[in-house]
Each structure stands twice: as structure tokens, then as C-alpha cells.
Amino acid sequence: MNGNIDLVVFTLDENRFALKLAAVERVVRVVEFTPLPKAPDIVLGIIAVQGGIIPVIDIRKRFRFPERETQLNDRLVIARTAKRSVALLADDVTGVMACPKERIVEAGKVVSGMAFVEGIVKIDAGMILIHDLDAFLSLNEENMLDDALRESAGSMNGE
């Protein structure tokens, strides 16, 4: 395993998380999102980006962090899964980090029950959890989100 993987590092309550840079489309300041009825609890709502509808995911709920009001300086990390683009709500984005592949430990070797964590990077100040966005939503959550998005699109089109 030679070479580096570029990671976009973001924070939630002083905890560090990352996505592979190749999956990240952009990072933007938080904007108001529209509620999406019948979506899974982890979905805060939807935003419109360049003519597309993107669900906003509350990763606080996935990690069972305390809820908090959205702040004006929060960020949305817009990234692509195999199925769709999603926006992850983060407290801040600290930057891009070139991480040597050999420093990434398989998540299953360190924590169990977190299929949505692909790997862990140990750093001087603790660790960074690398998300696997394709496993972030359960199959049931994916299906609920698909149905909610279809229903929302139908109501916008007057169906």
C-alpha cells in the first residue's frame, strides 16, 4: 500500500472525520434547508444545488452526538455516493490532508458496528474517522429517502 490518499477533514464537537477528496464535490457555508417529509431521521432536509436536489445528512445523529442548532459558520460537505450526491452537515472543515496509505487502519480492527467508517488515521491529536459514504445510510434509510425524494418531486410537479 504505497502512496497517499487525499482526505477532506471536518469536525463535529472537536472530533475529526474525513472523506476521500475524490468523493467531495465542494464545501459550502450552511444554507437553509427544506424539510423532507417521510425521510429517515438522519436526513435534516434538502437543498437545491445547480438545479439538483441534495439531501442534507445529520452525521451527529449517526454518531449519537448531542443535537445543536445549526450555526451560521457551519459547513456542508457535498459529496458523491454511488447513488447520489449528499450534503453532510459539519461544524467546520479544517482542510485537505495527504495521508500515507500505510497510516490508515481498517475500521473493523479498531471499532465494531460502524460499517460506515472505512478507516481510521491516528494523528498526534487523536484520530480521524474516514467515512464510507456508500455505507453511511442503511438499506432501509436509502429506500425511505428514495421514496421521500420521489414524493417530494411529485408534489413539486403537481402530481
Task: Describe each model-derived feature in a short phrase.
Residues M1-E159:
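An acidic, low-aromatic, low-complexity terminal/linker signal
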